[in-house]
Amino acid sequence: MAQSTLYSRVLGTGSYLPPDRVTNQQLTDRLAKEGIETSDEWIVARTGIHARHFAAPDVTTSDLALEASRRAIEAAGIDPQSIDLIIVATSTPDFVFPSTACLLQNKLGIKNGGAAFDVQAVCSGFAYAMATADSFIRSGQHRTALVIGAETFSRILDFKDRTTCVLFGDGAGAVILSASEEPGVLGSALHADGSYSHILCTPGNVNRGVIEGSAFLYMDGQAVFKLAVNVLEKVAIEALAKANLAPEQIDWLIPHQANIRIMTSTCRKLGLPQERMVVTVDQHGNTSAASIPLAFDTAVRDGRIQRGQHVLIEGVGGGFTWGASVFRY
C-alpha cells in the first residue's frame, strides 16, 4: 500500500504587540528634545509608517513570544504538550544563550523534551523558520511545531539616527504547524549572500564582558532598497514554481512589512492587485522577523484570509538573506 504524502498545515495563528503605541508625532517630539529633526510627513512619505509599538524596559523578546504563542495555541485548539518542535526567529534574543526558544518552551510549561532552537535571519527569519519547521514535519521527525517571529528591535536602535530609529518596532507573531495529509505548505525557497553583510547589520559583539563595536543597527537604506526589490520578485516566483502555482492563483501576499514602497513594488512585479496585499507596516512599523506572522494573524482574525486560500509570504533581511513560502491556509 502506497504511503500518503505528508504535509505541514497551519492550525492556528497568534500575535502580540506591547501596549506602548508610539505615533510618528510622539516619536518626532522625543527626537526633537535631542536636537534630531524629522516629521510625521517625512516618515509617512518615505516608509508608509504612522505608528509602532515599543516594549517596556522589563519586557523581553521571550515575553512577547509567549503572548503570541498562547494565542496561536488557543486558536489551534491543541494541548501545548503536543508541541514537539519550537523555532523562534529573532535577532534580538533575551540572552547570547540559551536560545529564546528554550526559554519560551519553559514559560509555556512544555516538558516533553521536544526540540527548541532559534533561527537568525533577521527580517526574513520567519520565512526561514517556517520552511525549516515544514521540512522537519515532512520528514516525519516532528508532528506539531510552534513557529514564532519575535523582536525587541527598540533595544538596538540609535535614537540619534533618524534614518533608522523611525522605522522599527517591537512585537511577536506565531503559527502552529502540524502534520497533515491535506496540503498546507506547498513550496519554499531560501537564499543568502554574505557579501552584503555590511549594508544592514548590528556590528557590535561581546568580548570579555565588553561590547566591542557599535551595539546599534546600521543600514545603508539605498543599497537595501535596490537589492530587496530585485531579489523579492525572484524568490517569490521560485516558491510559486515549487508550489506549481501562478501568481494570479495567490489570494493573499504577505510581504515583510519593511517599507510600503518595497512592498508595493513587489506586488506590482508579481502582477497582483494591491487589494490582495496585507499591509500592517502603517501601524506596526518594521518588526523584523515578527512582521510576517503579525500581518498573517491580523488578516486571519479580521476575516480577510479564509481557509482554503493560497498565501504567499516573502521577506528580505540582513545577511543578506531572503526567502518565500507558499501555503494553503
UniProtKB/Swiss-Prot annotation:
It is found in: Cytoplasm. Keywords: Acyltransferase, Cytoplasm, Fatty acid biosynthesis, Fatty acid metabolism, Lipid biosynthesis, Lipid metabolism, Multifunctional enzyme, Transferase. It comes from the Bacteria. Disulfide bonds: none annotated. Its EC number is 2.3.1.180. The keyword Lipid metabolism applies. InterPro entries: ACP_syn_III_C, ACP_syn_III_N, FabH, Thiolase-like. CDD domains: KAS_III. One of its GO terms (biological process) is fatty acid biosynthetic process. It catalyses: malonyl-[ACP] + acetyl-CoA + H(+) = 3-oxobutanoyl-[ACP] + CO2 + CoA. One of its GO terms (cellular component) is cytoplasm. SUPFAM superfamilies: Thiolase-like. The active site is at 123, 256, 286. Pathway: Lipid metabolism; fatty acid biosynthesis. Homodimer. Catalyzes the condensation reaction of fatty acid synthesis by the addition to an acyl acceptor of two carbons from malonyl-ACP. Catalyzes the first condensation reaction which initiates fatty acid synthesis and may therefore play a role in governing the total rate of fatty acid production. Possesses both acetoacetyl-ACP synthase and acetyl transacylase activities. Its substrate specificity determines the biosynthesis of branched-chain and/or straight-chain of fatty acids. Belongs to the thiolase-like superfamily. FabH family. The last Arg residue of the ACP-binding site is essential for the weak association between ACP/AcpP and FabH. This is Beta-ketoacyl-[acyl-carrier-protein] synthase III. It comes from Burkholderia lata (strain ATCC 17760 / DSM 23089 / LMG 22485 / NCIMB 9086 / R18194 / 383).
